[in-house]
Amino acid sequence: MERGRDRLHLRRTTEQHVPEIEVQVKRRRTASLSNQECHLYPRRSQQQQIPVVDFQAELRQAFLAETPRGG
């Protein structure tokens, strides 16, 4: 009985760990993508830190311009 219970417990723990691995893989993918994007731009632009807030504001304005008003 003890052995069967241990096996069940093992199976449960492995099932719980599967989604964590998937999340790590997704994180790695996004990290590698952002690394590639960084390599596209010259090092100089990394030194002058581009304000992220302005970029988000521009995105919001573009999004608002594309979406029909009152819809």
UniProtKB/Swiss-Prot annotation:
Major subcellular site: nucleus
Alphabetical UniProt keywords: Nucleus
Single Gene Ontology MF annotation: ATPase binding
Domain of life: Eukaryota
Pfam families for the chain: SNURF
GO CC terms of this entry: nuclear speck; nucleus
Compartment(s) where it occurs, according to its Swiss-Prot or TrEMBL record: Nucleus
Miscellaneous information on this protein: Encoded on a bicistronic transcript that code for two proteins, SNRPN and SNURF.
Protein family membership: Belongs to the SNURF family.
Name of the molecule in the record: SNRPN upstream reading frame protein
Organism: Rattus norvegicus (Rat)
